[in-house]
Amino acid sequence: MNELELKYGCNPNQKPARVFMKNGAALPFTVLNGKPGYINLLDAFNSWQLVRELKEATGLPAAASFKHVSPAGAALGLPLDEVDKRVYFVAPGAALSPIACAYIRARGADRLCSYGDWAALSDECDAATAAYLKNEVSDGIIAPAYSDEALAILKTKKGGKYNVVQLDPAYAPAPLEQKDVFGITFEQGHNDCKIDESLLQNIVTENKDLPEGAKRDMLLALITLKYTQSNSVCYVKDAQTVGVGAGQQSRIHCTRLAGQKADNWYLRRHPKVLALSFVDGIRRPDRDNAIDVYLSDECDDVLADGAWQRVFQERPEALTGEEKRAWLAQQRGVTVGSDAFFPFGDNVERARKSGASYIVEPGGSIRDDNVIETANKYGITMAFTGMRLFHH
């Protein structure tokens, strides 16, 4: 099959819609279940490239959770600790494979934004991954293969309409790519830049310490940024993104947005949050929403009389600003990546507030000296890659 008809394009009024191969070749993917839409497939093919490159760069299973053609999260398949399992709503005693851990961590980076996501796996989708996905709100998944048990589980989601796409892992795109805007065709070379440790050699700060875990996290940040709508900044901790700031016109707004997400990720691990007792039968999205509001300045929306009873078994104490600051002050070892240079040191200042110990960015600003000076002030290790990673 060299063409797949779609219900509509980005919006219901954009008809007809289809995906096809211009050269007449067969499509490199198969729809095993459901009927994916235009944006679903944009998410699928962008997310597949991300997880494929993560696997190539690190040798570890990789997963991503995509929404509107940007990753809400991406991660590698390291084991989950007991706190991770509680924060990510893993069922007690659940079997967890490396690829399942990768997806759970990717979705756990920003559970609020991953609502209705598109999942991407670098490796075969197994029953453990499918069982976790079954209980999450998700639009679809792409993987190079599916076990029989996993496929049977996934086919029960959304009343049997869950989108399951299998992509040929051997497929490689043409070296030139095209897209039309306003009837005008744009053509460019496919972004086939290879992201590996050779990009991390130019350490420009006084602190040259770059442990293996930080190198891995830098690669994760850079590959995530390569497939995130620009401008973009990414915070990574222990082989998973913890905050992705996408599609902002201002670099500092990217850094703030991603930093706020990273702060929320860490605050979800606060003992007061772990102690929240939810009413029986509450759905995961409702728990996520309640936690998000509880951590915000609008916490009274879930703590006021008449409100908390709908969510909690007992009224929790508020997490005070002082408690938040004290908890966040413990956060260290975070890696921050940027798809283009930091123009001013204020980005470093903001990143440091969310625990940044390592920064990777292209360099090339006329204010690089100021950026380096700010990193030196806090003992941050910073590498300049010389490679911009815009994505549109």
Predicted regions and their residues:
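Active-site loops and adjacent core secondary-structure elements that bind or stabilize anionic groups
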Residues: 1-199, 214-232
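Gly-rich Lys/Arg/Thr-decorated short loops/hinges at beta-loop-alpha junctions or inter-strand turns
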Residues: 23-35, 109-115, 189-208, 285-307, ...
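Conserved helix-loop functional segments at active or binding sites
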Residues: 53, 227, 264-268, 353, ...
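Flexible, glycine/charged-enriched surface loops at secondary-structure junctions
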Residues: 57-65, 165-167, 230-237, 267-278, ...
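Active-site-proximal loop/turn and secondary-structure-junction residues that shape catalytic pockets
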Residues: 70, 125, 237-240, 248, ...
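C-terminal binding/interaction regions
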Residues: 72, 117, 121-122, 135-165, ...
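Glycine- and Gly-Pro-enriched alpha-helical subdomains that act as flexible
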Residues: 72-112, 242-344
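Nucleic-acid 5′ end/cap handling module spanning
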Residues: 220, 228, 235-238, 245, ...
